[in-house]
Amino acid sequence: MEYQYPLDYDWSNEEMVTMVKFYEAIEKAYEKGIIREELMELYRRFKEIVPSKAEEKKIDKEFQEVSGYSIYRAIQRAKEIEEQKLVKM
């Protein structure tokens, strides 16, 4: 994709790598599908970096503006389906 991910320059390099992987997983859920456990593990790591609901909503809004993909909707879908299933939006 030809856009910039929302990143906070206060995050460590490791946290930035984790966030990019998480954004890529959300894209994958929309474009091809992703195994639920893979997405949920990245979401858990995302929540360690961004524990605040307000910050999570801000990042989701910024990501949706540049990509057209909703983090919230993808995670809600993942929570609704059974383990070992594909999350596809």
UniProtKB/Swiss-Prot annotation:
Protein's name in the database: UPF0223 protein BCA_4066
Stated family: Belongs to the UPF0223 family.
NCBIfam families assigned: PRK04387.1
Cross-referenced SUPFAM superfamilies: BH2638-like
